[in-house]
Structures are given as C-alpha cells and as structure tokens.
Design a protein with these regions (language model features):
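A generic local structural motif
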Residues: 7-9, 54, 143, 163-164
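Basic, low-complexity intrinsically disordered segments
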Residues: 4, 20, 166
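Sensor-1/coupling segment of RecA-like P-loop NTPase cores
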Residues: 1-10, 150
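Accessory nucleic acid-recognition modules appended to NTPase machines
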Residues: 77-197
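A secondary-structure boundary/capping signal
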Residues: 1, 22-27, 128, 179
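Conserved nucleotide-binding/hydrolysis micro-motifs of P-loop NTPases
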Residues: 2-5, 25-29, 163, 183
Length: 197
C-alpha cells in the first residue's frame, strides 16, 4: 500500500485511485504512424491477407534491419542512430546502478552486465538456466533470480510453450525473448544495422 503526505501531514492511501498500465516499446504500426488503422495480430489467412492489402509500402531488407537495430523506444526512433548508443548505455547504467542494485543487492555489477549480454544473445532461443549460468560464471539459483527480475521489469518475456496436454505445457521449456530489439542489438555489440545482415 503506497501512501503520500496529505495537506496537514496526514497520510492518504492511493488504494482504489491508481491503475498500473504496462507499456511496451512502440509497435511497428505506431512507428509508421498507422496505429489507428491497425488491428491486433491474428494468425489467420484472412488477417494476413487484409494486412498485406493495407500495407502502404514494401520494406527493403536494410530498412527492416534498421528498425531492429534501433529498437522500439520513442526517443531513439525520433533521433535515429546518432543518439542510440548514448541512450542505451545510459539506460543500462541507470538500470544496473539503481533498479537492480535496489532489488537484488548485486555485489558484482560486471557479472550482472555479462548476464544481460548473455540473455540478449539468447533471444528467441529455448531457455537453459544451466548454460546461461555457466557462461556467466554464476550458479543456477542466481541465474533464475536475475532472470525473474529482468522479466518483472519488462526487459524480457518468457514465452511458455503450448501443448494440448496441460501437464506437458508446464514441464516444457519456455523461449526467452528480449522485448526491445535495439537493446538486444546494443548489448550484443551490433554496431550498425548493416552488421545484422
């Protein structure tokens, strides 16, 4: 329960007056300024056909790599590559020095940075705690704790597998996704959109 000071020093609860809205980076439709025209993705032939017919332009492969390299943060897309490295460097420093330090009490910030890089390098792959921990030089328990903080803070998403059998769904391995492609590219040292090619 959060409390703030009222007028005469009284404490007032914010319960019932606050909503938490999770915002991800800008979508492709938002970056193209077509968000009002877009509908949520559905994996159907009808949706794909309709989306293709309303697409304004075909993208060149290098334009797609540029979009991946920049990521989905509004400021980076507004100014482009000229501020990208400064933005992501500052973002990582702030994230590690403030948020992570407060939550995890990480004593080895270099190890945590290596962990971030290792996670970014594994985007869209099956999650393997043992390999991740071994590559960074930490134990599995620490890798799980650190990964849960990355997930809770909106840096990554764990896509749980689908299976018609609920038991199999619970024991199968999830895939790990970095939510911002620009941050993943920055951490893995892709220095330009052309380097993604």
């Amino acid at each position: 329960r959060e409390q703030v000071r009222g007028g005469a020093g009284a404490l007032e609860s914010l319960a019932g007056r606050v909503a938490i809205i999770e915002l991800l980076g800008l979508s492709h439709a938002e970056l193209c300024q077509r968000a009002a025209l877009s509908t949520p993705f559905l994996p159907t032939i009808h949706w794909i056909t309709a989306a293709r017919s309303t697409a304004q332009t075909r993208w060149l492969l290098m334009e797609i790599f540029q979009r991946i390299w920049l990521g989905s943060y509004p400021r980076v897309n507004e100014y482009g590559g000229e501020i990208r490295d400064i933005f992501y460097r500052s973002y990582i420093q702030t994230y590690i020095q403030r948020d992570v330090q407060d939550v995890l009490k990480v004593t080895d910030q270099l190890a945590f940075h290596r962990f971030l890089v290792a996670v970014a390098a594994r985007t869209a792959q099956l999650l393997n705690y043992a390999n991740l921990a071994q590559d960074v030089g930490i134990d599995n328990k620490t890798a799980k704790a650190w990964l849960s903080v990355l997930e809770a803070s909106g840096l990554i998403f764990l896509l749980q597998p689908y299976h018609s059998n609920l038991t199999k769904r619970l024991v199968k391995t999830p895939k790990l996704y970095f939510l911002d492609t620009g941050l993943a590219a920055y951490l893995t040292k892709w220095n330009s959109a052309a380097s993604l090619e």
